[in-house]
Amino acid sequence: LDKTANTQRWHDDVRFYQVFNEHQQLIGGFYFDLYARPGKRGGAWMSGFQARYQHDDSGYQQLPVCFMVANFSPAPTGAQRGKPSLLTHDEVLTLFHEFGHGLHHLLTEVNVGDVAGVNGVEWDAVELPSQFMENWAWHPEGIALISRHVDTGETLPESMLQSMLAAKNFQSGMQTLRQLEFALFDLLLHAKTPAPDYPQLLALLDSVRADVSIMPTASYNRFA
């Protein structure tokens, strides 16, 4: 990575990095706009600014560029000036997740822009690199590399990480059942010919929930 100041940025908080491979060849660029500010859209996301493309006849090559946007708390001002921006573990997960999308976009070797990087990838498959990256924020070695106490500099204690993992995994089977509900409903819905109308759609969803869900769903619930 090479932090570059000589590029256009839409705010002073934005950082731009050029990305090189092991042969020191430039392969892309990555914008980071990580901190909340007035008027900025909420949430966190990664978007491709331009995709990798190469014209075989002329040899013209366009390198991928993407940007990651988040709304982390900026470094404090006033009496606390000089202190760093602090992230919760959930925010670290967000950082790793969106960074995974960025790597997916930047590390592509596909030369057709419409299907390079995150372009043209099914919505379920496009989440694979990002969710894979989240695992490093739960791994002891990964946490030891990136965590520091703001005052003492100590890494996150192993006991605290184990407590966080226990909380994460508590009733995690319920999350799996929820995903099974989505998957079965999707498969059954798209197998219907002709397409069901709204009452039939709700009846189909209720039948899936009756097979999969442990907790009953309120009768007034509307899937959205």
Give residue spans per PLM region.
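Cation-handling catalytic/transport regions enriched in His/Asp/Glu
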Residues: 1-224
